[in-house]
UniProtKB/Swiss-Prot annotation:
Protein name as catalogued: Cell division topological specificity factor
The organism's place on the tree of life at top rank: Bacteria
Species for this entry: Chelativorans sp. (strain BNC1)
Cited Gene3D superfamilies: Cell division topological specificity factor MinE
Keyword list, A-Z: Cell cycle, Cell division
Origin organism lineage: Bacteria, Pseudomonadati, Pseudomonadota, Alphaproteobacteria, Hyphomicrobiales
Record InterPro entries: MinE (IPR005527), MinE_sf (IPR036707)
GO biological process: cell division; regulation of division septum assembly
Xref: NCBIfam families: minE, PRK00296.1
Length: 87
């Protein structure tokens, strides 16, 4: 029985595995970033088009990657007479 090990650090393997999974997800996203943004843009347009008419040229999708966080910015210009309910 380890007397001094009782108060020591817990196993860090699960934490390291989780960090590695997050890192790999970010790396995979950055490798296919342009493809991912294009796919997301088309899917967003398709979902919005189910409810209102929107010009596909008025939909902008942008992905930024920082050291600690990645952001996805979506800008959709919806006309006042869109044929749907106002938000």
């Amino acid at each position: 029985m380890k007397i001094f090990g009782f108060f020591g650090k817990r196993a860090s393997a699960p934490m390291a595995r989780e960090r590695l999974q997050v890192l790999l997800a970010h790396e995979r996203a950055s490798l296919g970033k342009s493809d991912l943004v294009a796919i997301l843009r088309e899917e967003i347009i398709a979902v919005i088009a189910k409810h209102i008419q929107v010009d596909s040229e008025k939909v902008n999708v942008k992905m930024d990657r920082d050291e600690k966080v990645s952001t996805l910015e979506i800008d959709v210009e919806i006309p006042l007479q869109a044929g749907g309910r106002a938000a």
